[in-house]
């Protein structure tokens, strides 16, 4: 009974991760401001998942590989792939609509952001695979290398990943390219 309760709770948790994709209803395409806002909310959830995934992957690398930890990174990467597919399709449908310039800019930014978040999650899976290989080969890190990882994780933790932070990064890159 305890196992079935655990499995049921885990399934509910996984379904909840996809809740923000359900916001992307076809009927909202006729109302671009609402559709873009729902896409933004879903993309921010995707960013939270990407951040969790990269931190979990670094944790496997830093604190020791586990099959369960690897499975979780791999599972979240699959969830993020679903987000990318659903949001990308939704935003592409919006691009055919008449919209104000600011909404068009948001849609363009969000399409770039999708790629960034998906890439972050791909890197998380690569890091988790490296952690597995390190364990299989019996490789250990020097104290200096462990310290460097701690510095990276401390620097990264708490900053959050969202459309807003990615958007600033894209604007900064575009300004630098213009110079």
Language-model features, listed with the residues they occupy:
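Cytosolic, long alpha-helical scaffolding segments
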Residues: 1-179
